[in-house]
Regions:
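Helix-loop-helix hairpin linking two adjacent transmembrane segments in secondary transporters
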Residues: 3-48
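Juxtamembrane intracellular "pre-TM" segments in multi-pass secondary transporters
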Residues: 51-82
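A late C-terminal transmembrane helix in Major Facilitator Superfamily
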Residues: 193-232
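Small-residue (Gly/Pro/Ala) motifs that create kinks and tight helix-helix packing interfaces
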Residues: 11-23, 101, 133, 222-230
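Pair of pore-lining "gating" transmembrane helices in MFS-fold secondary transporters
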Residues: 75-93, 179-180
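C-terminal transmembrane helical hairpin of 12-TM major facilitator-type secondary transporters
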Residues: 144-190
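Structural signature of transmembrane alpha-helices in multi-pass secondary transporters
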Residues: 4-16, 42, 89, 122, ...
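Helix-to-loop junctions at the C-terminal end of transmembrane segments
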Residues: 129-144, 230
Length: 249
């Protein structure tokens, strides 16, 4: 579960960064061809290798039933609370990936190669967290473990904000604070996802889809809000205050 949810957390983060990096070496049409080929391969593998987990009841697909299940999921407070908690916890990382090229390359004068290396600790924090949860934590769903992850996240956000206020021209504080926050989020994300998925009797596929709908919609909106805050409402400090508020929420 920890590995799967870490993939869910990393995929929207690594994808845009990998695409931006590959555009330095490949034509954009070739990139679209690669994406299409990989999507076709994933579709074929799902058709031939996806295990069947639901016993057939001799009924066809009924859109009305699917819609009613989604309505029930959206009316479930645990599902919505979990989806919003996951979305807010992921916001500082997603907005950092979206705006860090502007902050570090355009405004900070960093080379693209150096910029790519600055993202390694951020992704490394999530990967290390998933390894810790999978290998060393016996009961990650215990309240004690959950409360122990929160100070890691808040410390990362405070390092991010305080370091940039004290040393505004040093990129190290942005990267180190975001990396520490990514470590805390990687520890907490699988637990929150599991709580939202299994704390009720609703169909798990519907609940997972509901969580992803909320999270992806929130992600798209948060990137636009963060972009406006950075360019129109105060620059880097205002942007990092937004990350701190999201982490606290």
């Amino acid at each position: 579960m920890a590995a799967l949810t870490s993939i869910v957390l990393l995929a929207p983060v690594i994808g845009p960064l990998a695409g931006a990096g590959l555009m330095n070496f490949l034509h954009w049409k070739l990139l679209f061809a690669i994406i299409g080929a990989m999507s076709l391969l994933a579709w074929a593998l799902l058709i031939f290798n996806m295990p069947e987990t639901v016993t057939s009841q001799g009924r066809g697909f009924r859109p009305g039933e699917v819609f009613s299940e989604f309505v029930r999921a959206f009316k479930q407070p645990v599902v919505l609370t979990g989806a919003l908690a996951l979305s807010f916890s992921n916001l500082p990382i997603i907005t950092w990936v979206a705006l860090s090229p502007v902050i570090l390359i355009d405004d900070g004068g960093m080379s693209r190669g150096a910029y790519a290396w600055t993202q390694v600790p951020v992704f490394g924090g999530v990967i290390i967290a998933s390894i810790i949860v999978a290998r060393f934590i016996k009961d990650p769903t215990s309240p004690r473990f959950i409360w122990r992850t929160i100070p890691i996240q808040l410390t990362g956000l405070l390092v991010l904000l305080a370091g940039n206020i004290a040393w505004p021209h040093t990129w190290w504080w942005s990267v180190s604070g975001t990396s520490l926050y990514a470590l805390g989020t990687g520890l907490l994300f699988p637990v929150l996802f599991r709580f939202a998925l299994f704390s009720h009797s609703l169909p798990k596929g519907t609940v997972s889809a509901t969580i992803n709908i909320v999270a992806l919609s929130f992600m798209a909106a948060s990137v636009e809000v963060a972009r406006w805050v950075y360019f129109q409402a105060g620059g880097r400090i205002a942007f990092q205050c937004l990350a701190l508020i999201a982490g606290i929420v």
